[in-house]
């Protein structure tokens, strides 16, 4: 196994260990750490990327778990999944709000459309099924980010700032219900995190 390290930051999501398993299945070493781990300790591991997990909270609530904002200045690529995606948006100047049935609340298998010019979706189909489970959505994405995936109900299923290496997806690529999810994770590891065999 490749001993370059990916750190999965745990924000309380139910699929955290599954994310780690998918990373390892792609041949990259991975450790799951609580979001409260001091940034200096995380950076001492010399990660080639961070993956922020999902979680049951809303980023705009006062007691919601957050990451040290200095992480975004560390020069390390970040992939946010569900809550992790919203966390990226929230910290970098976007706006996350509660969804309702008319504004992008999604649960279950969802037909999703991708911009395959984004490194995260390189070599993948422009349309596939993903597994959604979110009650919040990004009403406004941060400056410098592009919208790179959407569904019929949600205009911003995925965002990216390729210059800084920040990527976020509202869906769960780690679960089997998401077609090509493991391929997307592999792209993060090898195309963005620059892991090598």
PLM ranges: what are they?
Residues 116-163:
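Catalytic beta-strand/loop cores that center a nucleophilic Ser/Cys/Thr
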Residues 27-43:
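A short, well-structured beta->alpha microelement
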Residues 146-150, 154-167, 175-191:
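C-terminal and late-domain segments of enzyme folds
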Residues 5-26:
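Short, charged N-terminal beta->alpha structural module
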Residues 195-197:
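Conserved small/polar residues in nucleotide/adenosyl-binding loops
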Residues 21-27, 44-123, 129, 179-186:
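Cysteine-nucleophile active-site neighborhood
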Residues 30-32, 96, 147:
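Generic structural signal for residues in well-ordered beta-strands
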